[in-house]
């Protein structure tokens, strides 16, 4: 058995991710198998140490190093192997080398950087990505500091205070209860540019890591049945944030008329969007503004990506009803790109996102719950289109 283990270790140490080019499903399966193997081999003592000490300390050190500008300075200098003293000088802040020495050891132990010799380190591709502003990785990581970690730490106390009942009220969530402002997630983002930046950056990084929805939903069939004469809209991305999902539609269908794709979000969000195509136009719209209906009527499709999972079932029904009111019978579709929790075997990604949004009194949904939400909104469920990775699906619905 020892010989088999040694052979396996040797093979794993020479594994290059380049062999999975164009085979992401295979890469993902191997990563999940490796994760399962890790948890199988880990003892209860090791797991306790990792959960209680290693993981929270690792991220706090990573955030501190990002704040010093180390990764940014390292990337700007071309990367490369450096000693601790050199790295201290590359930092944007005046960092004591001895302090840096302690923290770099932990980064190397967690494969954020590589230890090449005593007091010498080289950046991994991920470390360089943290230092590259164009990737938005560094501000995306800050979502944990700004939003996720404080709320997660408050979660046990919140549940005790609410007698261990599932939170369903958007206005009385754990998130609101966590912070002194007593504001919802989106209200805090609107009030603080730093909080908005970490959220927007995370959404950008998160979206780029997902499979583009036109790859697993037939947008060509949707287009074939569309009437785009007289400026009629093709797809309205409701709460579309940065517009990446519409960009993917534009890339797949380069002959779409100008303005046929509509990006809808709050005024400050669409005001910060920089689009590189005339096929997409922006419309400022607040889903919750009293007395204001959906401004784009009779579109071929109303698309929402990771929008409804931010809200309770009751609020999600209200959002869908607002859209249903302006849909064209027999023509318009609602396309919900979101997590569909399987009845068994939910992935860590799916289950973690479920518990994350639960802290905002929302939840991810099973097929049964999605069916009820859609029916309660006066719509008819047509079909689920899974992404093939076990992350998300496109849920198609229409007027009955």
Curated annotation (Swiss-Prot):
EC main class here is: transferase
Question: Which positions does UniProt annotate for substrate binding?
Answer: 145-158
Q: What does this protein do?
A: O-methyltransferase; part of the gene cluster that mediates the biosynthesis of fumagillin, a meroterpenoid that has numerous biological activities including irreversible inhibition of human type 2 methionine aminopeptidase (METAP2).
What this protein catalyses is:
5-dehydro-6-demethoxy-6-hydroxyfumagillol + S-adenosyl-L-methionine = 5-dehydrofumagillol + S-adenosyl-L-homocysteine + H(+)
The active site is formed by 309
Keywords (alphabetical) are: Methyltransferase, S-adenosyl-L-methionine, Transferase
Report the SUPFAM superfamilies cross-referenced here: S-adenosyl-L-methionine-dependent methyltransferases, Winged helix' DNA-binding domain
Question: Can you tell me where the transmembrane regions are?
Answer: none
Biotech utility: Fumagillin and its derivatives have been intensely studied for their potential use in the treatment of amebiasis, microsporidiosis and rheumatoid arthritis. They have also interesting antiangiogenic properties by the irreversible inhibition of human type 2 methionine aminopeptidase (METAP2).
What factors induce this protein? Expression is controlled by the fumagillin biosynthesis cluster regulator fumR. Expression is also under the control of the developmental and secondary metabolism regulator veA. Expression is significantly up-regulated during infection.
Q: Is Ion transport there in the keyword field?
A: no
Q: Which organism is it from?
A: Aspergillus fumigatus (strain ATCC MYA-4609 / CBS 101355 / FGSC A1100 / Af293)
Q: In which pathway does it act?
A: Secondary metabolite biosynthesis; terpenoid biosynthesis
Protein name, UniProt field: O-methyltransferase af390-400
Source organism phylogeny: Eukaryota, Fungi, Dikarya, Ascomycota, Pezizomycotina
Q: Where does S-adenosyl-L-methionine bind?
A: 239-240, 265, 286-287
PANTHER family associated with the record: O-METHYLTRANSFERASE AF390-400 (PTHR43712:SF8), PUTATIVE (AFU_ORTHOLOGUE AFUA_4G14580)-RELATED (PTHR43712)
């Amino acid at each position: 058995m020892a010989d088999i283990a040694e052979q396996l270790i040797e093979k794993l140490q020479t594994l290059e991710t380049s062999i999975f080019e164009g085979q992401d499903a295979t890469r993902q399966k191997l990563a999940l198998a490796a994760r399962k193997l890790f948890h199988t081999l880990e003892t209860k003592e090791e797991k306790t140490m990792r959960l209680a000490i290693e993981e929270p300390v690792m991220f706090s050190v990573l955030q501190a190093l990002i704040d010093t500008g180390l990764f940014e300075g390292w990337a700007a200098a071309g990367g490369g192997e450096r000693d601790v003293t050199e790295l201290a000088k590359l930092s944007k802040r005046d960092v004591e080398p001895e302090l840096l020495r302690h923290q770099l050891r932990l980064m190397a132990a967690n494969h954020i950087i590589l230890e090449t010799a005593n007091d010498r380190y080289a950046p991994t591709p991920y470390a360089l990505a943290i230092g590259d502003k164009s990737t938005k990785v560094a501000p995306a990581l800050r979502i944990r500091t700004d939003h996720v970690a404080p709320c997660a730490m408050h979660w046990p106390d919140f549940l005790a205070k609410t007698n261990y009942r599932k939170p369903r009220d958007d206005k009385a969530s754990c998130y609101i209860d966590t912070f002194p402002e007593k504001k919802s997630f989106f209200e805090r983002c609107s009030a603080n540019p730093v909080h908005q930046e970490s959220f927007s950056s995370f959404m950008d990084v998160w979206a780029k890591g997902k499979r583009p929805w036109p790859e697993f939903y037939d947008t060509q069939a949707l287009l074939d049945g569309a009437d785009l004469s007289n400026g009629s809209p093709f797809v309205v991305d409701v709460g579309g944030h940065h517009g990446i999902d519409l960009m993917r539609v534009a890339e797949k269908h380069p002959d779409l008329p100008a303005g046929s794709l509509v990006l809808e979000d709050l005024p400050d969000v669409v005001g910060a969007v920089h689009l590189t195509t005339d096929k997409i136009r922006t419309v400022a719209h607040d889903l919750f503004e009293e007395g204001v209906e959906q401004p784009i009527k009779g579109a071929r499709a109303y698309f929402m990506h990771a929008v409804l999972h931010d809200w309770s079932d009751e609020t999600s029904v209200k959002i869908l009803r607002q859209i249903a009111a302006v849909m064209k019978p027999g023509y318009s579709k609602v396309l919900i790109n979101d997590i569909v929790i399987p009845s068994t075997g939910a992935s860590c990604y799916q289950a973690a996102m479920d518990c994350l949004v639960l802290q905002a009194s929302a939840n991810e949904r099973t097929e049964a719950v999605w069916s009820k939400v859609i029916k309660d909104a006066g719509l008819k469920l047509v079909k689920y289109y899974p992404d093939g990775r076990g992350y998300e699906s496109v849920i198609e619905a229409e007027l009955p």
